[in-house]
Amino acid sequence: MNAEVIIVGGGIIGCAAAYNLAKNGISVLVLEGSENIGNGGSTRNGGGVRQSGRDPRELPLVMYSIEHIWPQLSDMLDTNVEYYQEGNLRLGSTPQHQKILTGLADSAAAHGVDVRMITGDEARRINPYLSEAVTCASWCPTDGHANPLMATMGYYKMARRLGAHFISGEKVVELRKIKGAARQVVTASGNVYEGDKIILAAGYESRFIASTVGIDVPMQQVLLETLVTEAVGPMFWQMLGTADADFYGHQTEHGSFVFGLNSGLEPYAKPGKPLSSSIAASAACRGIMHYFPDLANIKVVRTWAGWMDACADHVPVISKVEEVPGLILACGFTGHGFGISPAVGLVLSQLAMEQETAVDLSALRYDRFQ
């Protein structure tokens, strides 16, 4: 099967790009290595849709997503993505935390984000479940959260409805050039697919696939862990984080809490097999109970782990590649991809269609590493 655009990777980035291309009448083929769409970080993350705490280079994408896409996304996809724009509290309890949070808030505010520092008492007025340990916080009222599974599946289903084709269990192992341009995709099963453009959005695997045409995106794998609790009655809707990044999360629409953290267990995980550990979950729970003592008796019902494709400078590569015409990179999202995915899907489609992009991507070009 051939298509005008081949997308390698069936996570939310690939699905969002497929949706935007198919909506414009472009024939699209999405190849996903695992048996399930969105089987990687796209459906395993904490669901944050945040501007606060981001590298300034990512802000145009997330600000565009929040202003123009997230509020309408459920209607666009005919799927409830459970988007709540109820703000983001990033918590601190020490003078060092105050310094960290002030730096993040000042940086974001300088780029037009509505974020400010507040006292512990002000934070407790926003969220009365916070403990007295909270002495400071950054507050961004326009941040929020959504359901990663529903958003990913929403993009997938609507892309299919618009004519995009998906093949799962088709692991891409090689790209091939024709007359100097990336045109063919080779899979582990020996199948060869051809397209006018190739979008590489396969997470950490993108590094190995890109290397087959001489391109190196400096990335490493980082292991993240997530825990989910039993469902309880509604308590609060803000997205949460901390100055030390020891946990992040929110309460979902159906009542459970979802919290995540970096586990640090990469040396112990087997290749391709994320390792979940009670050690990491316990560490997260201690931090959560420090700030939210009322959650102490809520039961944890499940934990899981997933790999994050961490770029060397902590922001993604979203870029054409001058050395390999026809190749478009979308990788290295470093755990920040979900919130910006609506805008990323849009700009990837615009790159593939040779259109001007909705936001400036110059700071995210591949050639910044050269």
Enumerate the predicted regions with their spans.
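Beta1/beta-strand and adjacent pyrophosphate-binding region of the FAD-binding site
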Residues: 1-13, 29
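Short beta-strand to alpha-helix junction loop
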Residues: 61, 90-100, 139-157, 273-280
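Dinucleotide-binding Rossmann-like beta1-alpha1 core, especially the glycine-rich loop
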Residues: 46-126, 246, 287-289
